[in-house]
Amino acid sequence: MKTKKVKLEYRTVFLSDTHLGMRETGIQKLNHFLSHISCKTLVLNGDFIDGWALEGSGQWKKAHTRCVRLILKMVEKEKTRVVYLRGNHDDFLSKILPITFDRIKICEKYIHKGKEKKYLVLHGDCFDSFSTKRRWIARIGSIGYDNLMRFNRFYNKYRKFRGKRPFSLSAWAKAKVKSAVNHVHRYEDSLADMARKHNCDGMICGHIHVAADRIIEGIHYLNSGDWVESNSAIVEEKDGSLEILDYDQFCKKLDEHKKATFYPRANFTSASKVVSKRRKTITQKIDSLN
């Protein structure tokens, strides 16, 4: 008999910046994540497919196809609703937006109605001047980022060999370069203003590959990060609460859920009683032989 796969259940899951088509992504971790979650709504908040990478030196791998199939399986088997929001790397979708078929909706922006609050959900590239006004610079930067990730992978292999923890070169660069830090702050402030204009209590976006969860002038700002480095998502629990969940935290929760599912407390108690009884019987037999 086939054992049913253990999954973590959520009301809504928000993913962004998976960049399928880039050579260096966390695709294996993403596939593991998708195969062990269940949700009513899955929001793909932009840059799900990296059209820029596929036009250049990118590569579509079998793991990327499996990712798409996992999502379609969620739609077919679990009746999950998928909302796919256009990003700047998959801007080819602009030609067909908006479009809805079956339980899949592809659009520019989306209003998520939580249990108590409303959130404006969009990729966020519309507030990035490099993406909107200097697109050619953004494309060059994308190529450089891909190459940096490739070098970072080999560098971390060396660090692992030396017994050291992985190191993110891009995160280090973002923290050190003052202009990059200021760019992130301006970006976040602009998004908060847009949320107010849409009469929303919060904003959920991606684009800048920096996971965040904070209040900006009364607006709940959330960024899901990415699946290139941070490997993180935003999950909405059944009670409506939202939190950022990175891959390591997800694996820990999944392990705890598996233990609770396959080895509940009652089973441990009954098993210990059986073991104790058998040990007592064996001890009595040994004593009788002596």
Identify the residue ranges that each predicted region occupies.
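Active-site-proximal loop/helix segment associated with metal-binding centers of metalloenzymes
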Residues: 122-187
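Conserved beta-sheet core of the metallophosphoesterase superfamily
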Residues: 102, 107-108, 118-120, 125, ...
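Binuclear metal-dependent phosphoesterase catalytic core
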Residues: 112-115, 215-290
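Active-site neighborhood of phospho(di)ester-bond hydrolases with catalytic His/Asp-centered motifs
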Residues: 15-16, 42-46, 82-88, 121-122, ...
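Short glycine-/acidic-enriched loop or helix-start segments at secondary-structure transitions
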Residues: 53-55, 93-96, 131-132, 213-215, ...
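Nucleotide/phosphate-binding catalytic cleft detector across ATP-hydrolyzing
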Residues: 1
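Core catalytic region of metal-dependent phosphoesterases/phosphodiesterases
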Residues: 5-11, 20-114
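Anionic group-transfer/hydrolysis microenvironments
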Residues: 18-19, 49, 125, 248
